[in-house]
Amino acid sequence: MKTATHPSYDEVRVQCACGNSFATRSTHKGDIHVEICSACHPFFTGKQKLMDTAGRVERFRRKYAKADKQADKQ
């Protein structure tokens, strides 16, 4: 069998733009810099903004209900 066919799997430091950092293992050489992590992402922090999809659905139904009524008249 060949020797040294697999890359080295070493510990690396991941640094976020918010200042958070953590250690993980990777074949990447050197530190990894990311723009967003689980400490600052709105989904994980619970500060995400929910969209009003119910209002959009009602507006869609009203729009096409009018179109159906006009089509029935013709």
Curated annotation (Swiss-Prot):
Q: Which cofactor does it need?
A: Zn(2+)
Q: Name one GO cellular component term.
A: ribonucleoprotein complex
Q: Which UniProt keywords apply?
A: Metal-binding, Ribonucleoprotein, Ribosomal protein, RNA-binding, rRNA-binding, Zinc
Q: Which residues bind Zn(2+)?
A: 16, 18, 37, 40
Which molecular function term from Gene Ontology is one that the record holds?
rRNA binding
Name a biological process GO annotation.
translation
Query: Mind telling me which PROSITE patterns this protein's record contains?
Result: RIBOSOMAL_L31
Cofactor detail note: Binds 1 zinc ion per subunit.
Q: Name one Pfam family in it.
A: Ribosomal_L31
**What InterPro entries does its record include?**
Ribosomal_bL28/bL31-like_sf, Ribosomal_bL31, Ribosomal_bL31_A, Ribosomal_bL31_sf
Q: Which domain of life is it from?
A: Bacteria
In the record, the note on similarity to other proteins reads: Belongs to the bacterial ribosomal protein bL31 family. Type A subfamily.
Its assembly, as annotated, is:
Part of the 50S ribosomal subunit.
PANTHER family from the UniProt entry: 50S RIBOSOMAL PROTEIN L31, CHLOROPLASTIC, LARGE RIBOSOMAL SUBUNIT PROTEIN BL31A
General function of this protein: Binds the 23S rRNA.
Name recorded for this polypeptide: Large ribosomal subunit protein bL31
What is the species of this protein?
Koribacter versatilis (strain Ellin345)
What gene name is listed for this protein?
Answer: rpmE
